[in-house]
UniProtKB/Swiss-Prot annotation:
It comes from Methylorubrum populi (strain ATCC BAA-705 / NCIMB 13946 / BJ001) (Methylobacterium populi). This is Protoheme IX farnesyltransferase. The keyword Cell inner membrane applies. Keywords: Cell inner membrane, Cell membrane, Heme biosynthesis, Membrane, Transferase, Transmembrane, Transmembrane helix. It is a multi-pass membrane protein. The gene is ctaB. GO terms for biological process: heme O biosynthetic process. Converts heme B (protoheme IX) to heme O by substitution of the vinyl group on carbon 2 of heme B porphyrin ring with a hydroxyethyl farnesyl side group.
């Protein structure tokens, strides 16, 4: 009986240890902001496929992985720096560092190792232009945005949005060795898309941002000014999103998605501008926030679909 008890205790101990190890791995993975990594992979891939070049699939796969790891590393460093304010916001209080599941020094070391590793491997596997752009993206997000802009100016999202807009540029550089007009246009689309996307959320979460001391636009310029700027950015985004059609790397499918999506963004922005009180305001803002994600996804998916269809036709011919 004693032997059986000891065996059961040992099994329980091993299970507990395995569970703890699994939890720690998932916590470190959470530091990488996996949902952001998925978006980075997606937009970087589009930057690759719109390039007028023969793409080596192995180099492309390694490059996408390293771009994703680099983005995750910058997210990890962002969480390390922002642990104090994350603890004050409901949306972020359960992140691994403020919740006490990972020590700040562990997160810092993890982020630095991944940053250096991703840049070096991308440089060796692809080229040093792409590696340099990835390094710039990491530094811009982790240092310039996280450590300076985020707590210093209401334009934090506008300027800092450059980091989130760079993956298509890095992706194109990785497979071609240069930066072309295609990826620069994609950069511009994401850059202009970012403010209305995040400010819609900021209108709803303004109280939390104020409590954390983050100068988001609704807390600095006021909700009315923020709503007007959301409309103006949406007006600018609609025609900008159609530039790929004018340049010839966006076809009819992309044009349809661009027109309908642009009108949808504008309609959502006007709705946010009109509804200014209570639950209707919150629903309008969160509706625009959600639609903006769908809009960008469909826009870039249309480019992927058209490039895939073009490749299929070329092979079939």
């Amino acid at each position: 009986m004693t032997s059986l008890s000891n065996s059961l205790s040992a099994d329980a101990g091993r299970a507990s240890l395995a569970s703890a190890a699994g939890g720690e791995v998932s916590d470190f993975f959470a530091l990488l902001k996996p949902r952001v990594m998925v978006l980075v992979i997606f937009t970087a891939l589009v930057g690759m496929v719109v390039s007028d070049a023969t793409v080596n699939p192995v180099i492309a796969a390694i490059s996408l992985l390293m771009i994703a790891v680099g983005a995750g590393a910058s997210g990890c460093l962002n969480m390390w720096w922002d642990a104090d304010i994350d603890a004050l916001m409901t949306r972020t209080a359960k992140r691994p560092i403020p919740d006490g599941r990972i020590r700040p020094d562990e997160a810092l070391a993890f982020g630095i190792v991944l940053s250096v590793g991703s840049v070096l491997i991308l440089g060796l596997a692809s080229n040093w232009l792409a590696a340099g752009l990835l390094a710039f993206t990491i530094v811009f997000y982790a240092v310039i945005y996280s450590m300076w802009l985020k707590r210093a100016t209401a334009q934090n999202i506008v300027i800092g949005g450059a980091a989130g807009a760079l993956p298509p540029v890095v992706g194109q550089a990785a497979v071609t060795g240069h930066v072309g007009i295609e990826s620069l246009v994609l950069f511009a689309i994401i850059f202009i898309w970012t403010p209305p996307h995040f400010w819609a959320l900021a209108l709803v979460k303004s109280g939390e941002y104020a409590r954390a001391g983050i100068p988001m636009m609704p807390n600095v310029a006021g909700p009315d000014s923020t709503r007007r700027q959301i409309v103006w950015y949406s007006l600018l985004l609609a025609p900008l999103a159609l530039v790929p059609v004018w340049l010839g790397f966006g076809g009819w499918l992309y044009a349809v998605v661009g027109v309908l999506g642009g009108l949808g963004m504008l309609a959502g922005a006007v709705q946010v501008y009109r509804l200014r009180e209570g639950e209707p305001e919150r629903k309008a803002a969160m509706g625009l926030f959600a639609f903006s994600i769908l809009y960008l996804f469909l826009l870039f998916s249309a480019l992927l679909a058209e490039q895939g269809l073009g490749l299929f036709r070329a092979v079939a011919a």
